[in-house]
């Protein structure tokens, strides 16, 4: 029998690992599956996207016989953003591969997948938190009543329009004890979205540790003054519907006053005829320029493998009318 040699590509094959990486990323995404993926930028020049959104002209009015109807000005808003890249890289020594302990190549693959998935989810949630519609004041714990108030903010004209509510795992116990909560095992397979724990007030419920806990509040008597250096840090700690600027002051909230901000995302269009047209944009859109790729570099003088994962994309809140931020006491 001829001798066989194990080559480097037998251990680290970027093409094979890239496919596995994509599969693992998809499995680990928590929020991204509830955004629409737009691939119109793939394979075309340019890295900037302008997202339009028409404003409603209002309902029609009664007009008397022989009277000329007044014209209504159409208005639109838009946001422009630049495609960015998310990257993560790890180094593996040849010695660690040779040792055969712990499968370092497989572990690197899993860690890179988790890293890219986490970044995309963070960006999706950040866009959801730009929504202007909110419900509650954060003084009551999560409940059926509070979620009904949040869900009806959409003013749906059709029944049964699918919505997804994201809660922090710390809120799960309270919700499970609510008599109006229906656990996922009570539904037929395929009815619930992947990973949903149940349904309440017309919303399927998913858990995510990325749901924001508000620990600071804007206050003119606050002890911390906002500057360019700490603006991003404290903006992430206050109610997302509050916009901080340099010179503002914030104060820490006592534990009893802290609250979660739970996004409720409307998943369906109000009408099948207008689904995801310019007039009926989805809540959040991921503009994918280049899907996740994996590159492998070998440095023989150091006997080190570098594995680098990257994804080029942009995320935008494309329809703020389809996101409500529900506030519930910690």
Outline where the language-model segments fall.
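Sequence/fold signature of self-assembling virion shell proteins
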Residues: 2-34, 42-45, 77-83, 178-330
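Short N-terminal helix-initiation segments at or just after the protein's N-terminus
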Residues: 27-36, 54-56, 103-111, 269-272
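N-terminal low-complexity, intrinsically disordered segments
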Residues: 45-78
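Long, contiguous amphipathic alpha-helices that act as assembly "spine/axial" helices in icosahedral shell
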Residues: 51, 75-137, 155, 159-165, ...
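Flexible glycine-/small-residue-rich
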Residues: 53, 169, 207
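Short, solvent-exposed loop/turn elements at domain surfaces
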Residues: 58-62, 174, 214-215
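Extended, solvent-exposed, turn-rich assembly/linker loops in the middle of proteins
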Residues: 130-203
């Amino acid at each position: 029998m001829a001798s066989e040699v194990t080559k480097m590509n037998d251990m680290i094959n970027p093409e094979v690992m890239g496919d596995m990486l994509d599969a693992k990323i998809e499995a680990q995404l928590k929020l991204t599956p509830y955004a629409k993926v737009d691939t119109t930028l793939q394979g075309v020049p340019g890295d900037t996207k302008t997202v339009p959104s028409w404003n409603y002209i209002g309902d029609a009015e009664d007009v008397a016989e022989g009277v000329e109807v007044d014209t209504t000005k159409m208005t639109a808003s838009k946001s422009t953003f630049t495609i960015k890249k998310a990257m993560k890289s790890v180094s593996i020594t040849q010695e660690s591969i040779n040792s055969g302990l712990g499968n370092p190549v497989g572990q690197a693959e899993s860690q890179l997948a988790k890293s890219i998935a986490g970044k995309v989810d963070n960006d999706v949630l950040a866009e959801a938190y730009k929504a202007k519609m909110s419900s509650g004041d954060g003084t009551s714990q999560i409940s059926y009543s509070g979620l009904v108030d949040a869900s009806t903010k959409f003013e749906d004209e059709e029944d049964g329009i699918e919505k997804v509510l994201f809660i922090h795992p710390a809120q799960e116990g309270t919700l499970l004890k609510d008599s109006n909560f229906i656990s996922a095992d009570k539904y037929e397979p395929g009815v619930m979205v992947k990973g949903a724990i149940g349904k309440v007030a017309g919303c399927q419920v998913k858990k995510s540790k990325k749901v924001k806990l508000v620990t600071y509040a804007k206050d003119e008597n606050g002890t911390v003054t906002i500057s360019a250096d700490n603006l991003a840090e404290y903006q992430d700690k206050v109610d997302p519907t509050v916009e901080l600027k340099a010179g503002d002051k914030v104060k820490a909230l006592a534990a009893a006053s802290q609250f979660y901000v739970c996004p409720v995302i409307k998943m369906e269009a109000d009408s099948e005829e207008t689904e995801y047209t310019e007039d009926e944009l989805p809540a959040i859109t991921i503009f994918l320029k280049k899907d996740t790729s994996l590159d492998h570099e070998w440095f023989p003088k150091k006997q080190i493998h570098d594995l680098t994962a990257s994804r080029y994309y942009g995320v935008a809140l494309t329809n703020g009318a389809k996101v409500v931020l529900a506030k519930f006491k910690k």
